[in-house]
A protein has these predicted regions:
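Extracellular hydrolytic enzyme modules, especially secreted metalloproteases
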Residues: 2-176, 184-189
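Extended, compositionally biased non-globular segments
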Residues: 186-202
């Protein structure tokens, strides 16, 4: 949409960038490439310009918010803390596009990569499964190789595991505050939690 978004300044009357779905599909009178009417169901809205209370009329919105919202269209949840009832947390923080990594660089002009969990959900990475004792393992830089190790948690085969990635300051990860091994503990039995902004589960 034209103008700025509320992600810069939540108290203003601008629209929040978001992804959602209509309760009922909307069938347009427009014909698509397949010859059928175009149907609108899932959508995303993003601002044209950067700025909060005052729009920066000469600054096109950096790509971080667009990339984050497109992640939702692909089916990914927000991975930042939306409910501090159990204590404040940054979720995955700047280490993932689906958390605050969408804001890296100048207000999101160089957003971080998605975490290995996100890329695994989308089928974009194939982890190397470590299912026996080893003394060492090589793991390439995640941003350039997509390398990720998967280690099952003892007695929880198929639903609890660790993902290990090597994050270095290169490419879209060049604005991370640090670098090294990221180890995620995944429990597939847990739901994604309540998304307070959309009022439902994500």
């Amino acid at each position: 949409y034209s103008g700025c978004g509320a992600e810069w300044s939540p108290g203003n009357s601008n629209i929040w960038p978001h992804q959602s779905s209509l309760d009922e599909e909307y069938v347009t009178n427009d014909i698509g490439v397949n010859g059928d009417n175009i149907i609108v169901s899932t959508y995303a809205v993003n601002p044209e310009l950067a700025g909060g209370g005052e729009c920066w009329t000469d600054v096109i919105r950096p790509m971080g918010v667009y990339a984050h919202e497109f992640g939702h269209i692909l089916g990914l949840p927000d991975l930042y803390d939306k409910n501090s009832a159990n204590g404040d947390s940054e979720g995955l923080g700047e280490w993932c596009l689906m958390a605050s990594g969408s804001w890296l660089g100048f207000a999101g002009d160089v957003p971080a990569h998605m975490s290995s969990w996100c890329k695994l959900q989308l089928g974009w990475v194939e982890p190397v499964v470590i299912d026996q004792n080893i003394s060492s393992a090589n793991i390439g830089t995640f941003a350039t190789t997509g390398s990720v190790l998967k280690v099952w948690e003892d007695d929880y085969y198929w639903n609890r595991y660790f993902l290990i990635e090597n994050r270095q300051k290169t490419g879209f990860d060049s604005n991370l505050n640090g670098e090294g091994l990221m180890i995620y503990h995944i429990d597939e039995n847990q739901n994604y939690g309540l998304n307070e902004m959309s009022g439902g589960f994500v």
